[in-house]
Amino acid sequence: MATEGKKLTTILSIDGGGVRGIIPATILAFLESELQKLDGKEARIADYFDFIAGTSTGGLVTAMLSSPDPDDPSNRPFSAGKILQFYFAESPNIFPQKPKQPRQIDEMSRLEHAVNQFVQSMGSIPEDEYGRERLRFMFPDCRSLIDLVVRLWKFVFDPKFNGEKLKEVVEEKVGDRRLSETLTNVIIPSFDIKLLQTVVFSTLKAARDDLEDAPLQDVCLSTSAAPYYLPLHKFEINSVNRSRNFNMVDGGVAANNPTLLALSEVAKEMSLDGKAQCLDNMDCSKFLVLSLGTGSSKRNNKLEIVNENWGPLRWLWGDNGIPFLDVLMNAIDAMVDIYLSAFFRGASFEDNYLRIQTDSLNDSEIGMDNSNLENLQNLENIGNELLEKPVSAMNLETGLLKPIRGAGTNRAAIIKLAKRLSEERKRRLAQSST
């Protein structure tokens, strides 16, 4: 068992949030730099965490952190700094601000041609210059109307982005590696819409069962198949005389903050007799958990009821996101944070759980697909500013983050965490050499 003989079980958890993954990536880059100060330039995040859990964009980060960097001749895992660069390089391609829509252009041309044929069949093509000029003015308006109809059709029936660039990037970063081949244990949730059930992709499960051993590419595309934004993902695993079909949507609909899910999965792995398969029976002194959020806009009152009669369109169409998903994911995230804070504090081991999150994003920053360079830079700045803010926990009465008295800054907490991770790794290396 992967956790046997260890003084601490170390867990890293990364929320979903699209381009807002820059925020946790920035914090991870700082953590890795501190680890490198202690253990050398070759230190990588994957060397220090027994389990890395991630949802959606956090799942992509998880997969990269636990995969060899194809540009590294020594096959070391991706560095956190390189993952931060990945967001700046690829976000504009995955989430283009003005996505090309060749199907829309073809459809408009076809419809315009049909209108032209109809006019000809009616024998009303103007022969005089004045009539032809009127027709020339009519077609731009017609094209505008067609454009509106086609855009509305695509909004209702198609994802906002075609996902082709995401597939290319995932293939480039993780190659043909399978889930059982990650460099540390990963836990990546998704949701099967056919079974209406959360699917947890796990390295340890994959090592035991071929039907759990999905290609890492499919895992990434499953956990990041955000409703409305990207296509769903369907794939199949075949084994000897067995097969399994997956019909997947973004893991954020079930566990946008995967920390609690990760602890639950670890509890199952650590249980030999079934007695410890719930958190109540776990000794939290044996866990060291870092949970990284991608930000929320709670303080900016993003949603407000002006008209009480919200139909399907109001729930699905907001200025900077999907109100239904925003409410669902924020509610789940809040409950996970509240439960885990109480769990570790109640056992007087609050230093074993560090959650870094902001609830002050504005309307521009909260968009998961806002790949504008200025916004990406703002998100990186937010990550750096978070390091200087005090360690915080959610206030149960207000639902807002409140500084924990005497806990210091997130920077100081990360530096302290780096030392504990380094000491734990050195202890294990010394133990394995004797």
What is each of the regions a protein language model found here?
Residues 1-434:
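Conserved catalytic cores and adjacent C-terminal regulatory segments
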